[in-house]
Amino acid sequence: MSKPLRGRHQARKRAVDLLFEAEARGLSPAEVVDVRTGLADTNPEVAPLQPYTAAVARGVGDHAAHIDDLISSHLQGWTLDRLPAVDRAILRVAVWELLYADDVPEPVAVDEAVQLAKELSTDDSPGFVNGVLGQVMLVTPQIRAAARAVRGPRDT
């Protein structure tokens, strides 16, 4: 059972890498996914992206404005552009999971983000990420309910 969970952790970590790369290169997450997929298709030494990695990166790109607005509204004393780029990417992955990944329990999304912050960012980042996501979690049920209402029962 730990194998799939570890696989998801690696997929999230790779999604953070892709989002970081997209921002650094001025590309959309979908463009970076396409480039990486093309490299894997043409070069056997390049590992293909896991489907969950591509889904997360594309999902963050598709909902970037909403995700960034939600993160920004829960930052205290910070602006999104002042955060370290890796923290932005971690928060974006976690918020996408909180809002759009129905198969990921909210505490798992937060715990995974905190773990990624421990692995990839500064000593202060895990606590910061946990605090921001704790605040976001307070409003995600309402956001999900509103999205379901807009989509209607046949689209869920």
Curated annotation (Swiss-Prot):
GO terms classed as biological process: DNA-templated transcription termination; transcription antitermination
Keyword Transcription regulation: yes
UniProt cross-references to Pfam families, sorted A to Z: NusB
Key words of the record: RNA-binding, Transcription, Transcription antitermination, Transcription regulation
GO terms assigned for molecular function: RNA binding
Record flagged with keyword RNA-binding: yes
GO-annotated cellular components: cytosol
Alphabetized InterPro entries for the sequence: NusB-like_sf, NusB_fam, NusB_RsmB_TIM44
Coiled-coil regions listed: none
Protein function: Involved in transcription antitermination. Required for transcription of ribosomal RNA (rRNA) genes. Binds specifically to the boxA antiterminator sequence of the ribosomal RNA (rrn) operons.
NCBIfam families in alphabetical order: nusB
Family: Belongs to the NusB family.
Protein name: Transcription antitermination protein NusB
Gene expressing this chain: nusB
